[in-house]
């Protein structure tokens, strides 16, 4: 292996610095900068398997597999280093290379890092050794892939999928798979008892700190907080301090999302904790709301009606109920006078929209949809907390819940497309149900397509492998026995926008909508098939299966009216019979997470979102790097580059003739958001957990509260579980859509995980001082009795120090509001 001299090192560094700043306008410069960075790092990485084992063997939980197959591994790794797959990896641009060395490659003694080749060897070796350790898991793999016999053929199976990047793993898996005593779960959910000061202390110092130490994103339910008479802001600041401590000097920042229901007496103070003008804000954490459908029904039908607030100690069973049972309990408590305050429901919506526009959150989930579509009945123990990215849903009161994530790189499933990976076997053996399905999507490519279509066979192969990868991480890397036994899996995707563009379609074209549903139906079907095989051969069926809806022949899509299936119902029925007979290893299957971290490695678009920008920046641990849309620049004609560079790649700013040529590369901000919501609804029947559905608004649209409020109502009407993950705002003054650094006042998550750490996902830019009207807190005891004891008959109390208006013609206008200072502002 060639090494670099001091002079060469300096020269390479200067060349990289010169080239990387051109990445958004010169794709060749981006590729060259990435290749040079790999060359620059060659001196500090391991070169042979023998050297790798010498440096890292004391870190492995199973060194024996690597030692036993050392020579064979050297052969595989050497062949990979000369392969087209490796060439694609090192040619994926500067940000991809930076991400490897900055985050994913394991560091050993004396600062020696594993090489990219050995990184993939470690991941595949972990999966292979785990598969060989569990005889049932190996038997299931051989049932799915009968051609696999020897240990090294098991290794090859995982190695080929990982190095071809058809299967991409979460950040915890990529960083710690194979490392002794590591937790590989991406998400941790907990709803602790917060009813007393002692309970809060236990929850924070005994449990939360441990979860953050394990470098996982955490979702915490805080609806039960405040019963001890303390302000919720105190609890939020304590959580924020925990996060900031654990993130100091850390390669992979983590965070916490705190979830509350909107009937809580301190809901306004809860929302306030993220507002940039709040000098005690909590920039390191995120807020989320589990909103009952009653709230949306009242806002839509009678927006001036009262919304009642309750102290959690007087709220009866509100926290544990949903649907009609929740409504009955809510009105029973109101009739009994148990409420401690009331506010116009418009006023509360004002505050929610205000916070979303200025801080990007709260994340908003529909309580009924999350609970009613779960695999068992949750009435009386309803979920009211999700994970850090609002796509993983599990009950978490009785024990901590976890989820292991992976995702499929959809562009690798294109037929004859550049960078596509061809299947290496004939589909004549394996799971008979999967073999009965079509190999290609019937949706035909459009004009300008670079591929001949989308390969459903490759998608199913990748989904099957991802299910085995997640099974390995569950069996060897779960933090508790309870979470391991539940075997919650979340399979997502990246590069959906790339697929549509490569097939010649705009994101919301009819063919895109058709393939959108088809992809997730086949993923859900394949994950169920594979999980059933694993359960049969390992004899590990998740607890509660016999009481689950699956045991009665149920599928998640049964609960969604009007679901069109591309897989014949006869084949679904055969799968149902198999599951009823053999059970399931996993309790959950599909969760569409943000994939910012691993999408940077592959150079694909993030998750299932439309393109965020064609030329943007990304903040890493060490620098702010340019991030070009590689699919876009691959399709740009040479004679169009200058015009596109002038507008930062923004298609909407081009002259009409040129704009028409590149319409399929419009950004998420250019599309009608209701169309994007509808596409989320189309795939929802096959997403048994949830999807991190974000909204993308232009600044002029976000300046009207009605825009965002109407979109939230529309998502509710369509029954989405996650109504809104982020609210992202495109600044009107920007000539190019740029993902900028968060200001000192704001900190927005970064994403991993396949991930989740919203510490990599940059927040929407804050708007100028709040664009929303509404009270910060209204705790009235009766009609017209305000926070300071003053009365405004027939009006709604608003502290003028917090009153900031939308346009006068806004749906959420402020007619009838009366201004005066509340007691705390006088």
Swiss-Prot record:
Catalyzed chemical reaction(s): a 2'-deoxyribonucleoside 5'-diphosphate + [thioredoxin]-disulfide + H2O = a ribonucleoside 5'-diphosphate + [thioredoxin]-dithiol
Catalytic residue list: 387, 389, 391
SUPFAM superfamilies listed in its UniProt record: PFL-like glycyl radical enzymes
InterPro entries reported for this sequence: HSV_RIR1, NrdE_NrdA_C, RNR_lg_C, RNR_lsu_N, Rrm1
Record-marked site positions (Interacts with thioredoxin/glutaredoxin): 822, 825
Gene Ontology MF terms: ATP binding; ribonucleoside-diphosphate reductase activity, thioredoxin disulfide as acceptor
GO biological-process terms attached to the record: deoxyribonucleotide biosynthetic process; DNA replication; release from viral latency
Annotated site, Important for hydrogen atom transfer, chain positions: 187, 403
NCBIfam families in the record: NrdE_NrdA (TIGR02506)
Region of interest (Disordered), ranges: 747-769
Stated name of the protein: Ribonucleoside-diphosphate reductase large subunit
Keywords linked to the UniProt accession: ATP-binding, Disulfide bond, DNA replication, Early protein, Nucleotide-binding, Oxidoreductase, Viral latency, Viral reactivation from latency
Site (Important for electron transfer): residue numbering on this chain: 725-726
Gene3D superfamilies linked to this entry: 3.20.70.20
HAMAP family (alphabetical): HSV_RIR1
Similarity section: Belongs to the ribonucleoside diphosphate reductase large chain family.
Biased composition, class Basic and acidic residues, residue ranges: 749-758
Subunit relationships: Heterotetramer composed of a homodimer of the large subunit (R1) and a homodimer of the small subunit (R2). Larger multisubunit protein complex are also active, composed of (R1)n(R2)n.
Binding site for substrate: 171, 186-187, 217, 387-391, 594-598
Cysteine disulfide partners in this protein: 187-403
Function: Ribonucleoside-diphosphate reductase holoenzyme provides the precursors necessary for viral DNA synthesis. Allows virus growth in non-dividing cells, as well as reactivation from latency in infected hosts. Catalyzes the biosynthesis of deoxyribonucleotides from the corresponding ribonucleotides.
Top-level division of the source organism's lineage: Viruses
Pfam families the record matches: Ribonuc_red_lgC (PF02867), Ribonuc_red_lgN (PF00317)
EC number in record: 1.17.4.1
């Amino acid at each position: 292996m060639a090494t670099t001299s001091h002079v060469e090192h300096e020269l390479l560094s200067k060349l990289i610095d010169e080239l990387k700043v051109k990445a958004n306008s010169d794709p060749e410069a981006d590729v060259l900068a990435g290749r040079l960075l790999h060359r620059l790092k060659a001196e500090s990485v391991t070169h042979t398997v023998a050297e790798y084992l010498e440096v890292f063997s004391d870190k492995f939980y199973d060194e024996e597999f690597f030692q036993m197959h050392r020579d064979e591994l050297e052969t595989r790794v050497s062949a990979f280093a000369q392969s087209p797959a490796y060439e694609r990896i090192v040619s994926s641009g500067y940000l991809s290379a930076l991400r490897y060395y900055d985050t994913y490659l394991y560091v050993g003694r004396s600062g020696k890092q594993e090489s990219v080749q050995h990184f993939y060897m470690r991941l595949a070796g972990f999966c292979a050794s785990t598969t060989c350790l569990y005889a049932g898991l190996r038997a299931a793999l051989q049932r799915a892939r009968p051609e696999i016999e020897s240990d090294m053929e098991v290794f090859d199976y995982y190695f080929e999928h990982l190095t071809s990047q058809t299967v991409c793993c979460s950040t915890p898996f990529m960083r710690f798979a194979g490392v002794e005593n590591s937790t590989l779960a991406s998400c941790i959910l907990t709803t602790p008892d917060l009813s007393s000061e002692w309970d809060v202390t236990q929850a924070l110092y005994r449990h939360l700190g441990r979860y953050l130490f394990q470098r996982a994103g955490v979702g915490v339910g805080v609806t039960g907080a405040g019963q001890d008479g303390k302000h919720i802001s105190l609890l939020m600041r304590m959580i924020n301090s925990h996060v900031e401590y654990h993130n100091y000097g850390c390669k992979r920042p983590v965070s916490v999302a705190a979830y509350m229901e909107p009937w809580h007496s301190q809901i306004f103070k809860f929302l306030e904790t993220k507002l940039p003008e709040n000098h005690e804000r909590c920039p390191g954490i995120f807020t989320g709301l589990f909103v009952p459908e009653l709230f949306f029904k009242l806002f839509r039908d009678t927006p001036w009606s009262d919304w009642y607030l309750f102290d959690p100690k007087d709220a009866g069973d509100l926290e544990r109920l949903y649907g009609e049972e929740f409504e009955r309990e809510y009105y029973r408590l109101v009739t009994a006078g148990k409420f401690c305050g009331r506010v116009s429901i418009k006023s509360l919506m004002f505050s929610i929209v205000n916070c979303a526009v200025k801080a990007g959150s709260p994340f908003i989930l529909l309580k009924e949809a999350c609970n009613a579509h779960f695999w068992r009945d949750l009435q009386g123990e309803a979920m009211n907390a999700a994970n850090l990215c609002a796509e993983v849903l599990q009950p978490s009161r009785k024990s901590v819940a976890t989820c292991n994530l992976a995702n499929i790189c959809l562009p690798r499933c294109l037929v004859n497309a550049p960078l596509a990976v061809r299947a290496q076997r004939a589909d004549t053996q394996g799971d008979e149900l999967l073999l009965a399905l079509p190999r290609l999507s019937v949706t035909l490519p459009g004009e300008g397509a670079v591929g001949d279509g989308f390969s459903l066979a490759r998608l199913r192969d990748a989904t099957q492998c991802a299910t085995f990868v997640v099974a390995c991480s569950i069996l060897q890397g779960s933090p508790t026995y309870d979470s391991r036994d539940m075997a919650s899996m979340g399979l997502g995707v990246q590069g959906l926008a790339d697929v549509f563009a490569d097939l010649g379609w705009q994101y919301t074209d009819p063919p895109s909508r058709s393939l959108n549903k088809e992809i997730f139906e086949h993923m859900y079907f394949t994950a169920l098939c594979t999980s059933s095989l694993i359960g049969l051969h390992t004899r590990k069926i998740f607890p509660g299966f016999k009481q689950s809806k699956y045991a009665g022949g149920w599928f998640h899509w049964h609960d969604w009216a009007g679901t069109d299936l591309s897989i014949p119902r006869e084949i679904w029925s055969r799968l149902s019979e198999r599951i009823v007979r053999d059970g399931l290893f996993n309790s959950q299957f599909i969760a569409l997470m943000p994939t910012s971290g691993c999408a940077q490695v592959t150079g694909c678009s993030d998750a299932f979102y439309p393109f965020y920008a064609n030329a943007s920046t990304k903040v890493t641990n060490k620098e702010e790097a340019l991030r070009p849309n590689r699919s876009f620049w691959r399709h740009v004609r040479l004679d169009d580059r200058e015009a596109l560079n002038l507008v930062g790649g923004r298609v909407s700013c081009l002259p009409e003739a040129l704009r028409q040529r590149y319409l399929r590369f419009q950004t998420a901000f250019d599309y009608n958001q209701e169309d994007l919501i509808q596409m989320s609804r189309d795939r929802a029947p096959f997403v048994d957990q949830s999807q991190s559905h974000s909204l993308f608004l232009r600044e002029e649209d976000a300046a009207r509260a009605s825009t965002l409020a109407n979109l939230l109502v529309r998502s509710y009407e369509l029954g989405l579980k996650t109504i809104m993950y982020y609210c992202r705002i495109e600044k009107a003054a920007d000539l190019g859509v740029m993902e900028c650094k968060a200001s000192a006042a704001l900190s927005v998550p970064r994403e991993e995980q396949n991930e989740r750490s919203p510490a990599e996902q940059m927040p929407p830019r804050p708007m100028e001082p709040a664009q929303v009207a509404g009270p910060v807190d209204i705790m009235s005891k009766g009609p017209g009795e305000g926070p300071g004891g003053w009365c405004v008959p027939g009006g709604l109390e608003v502290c003028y120090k917090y009153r900031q208006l939308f346009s006068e013609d806004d749906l959420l206008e402020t007619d009838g509001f009366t201004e005066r200072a509340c007691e705390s502002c006088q």
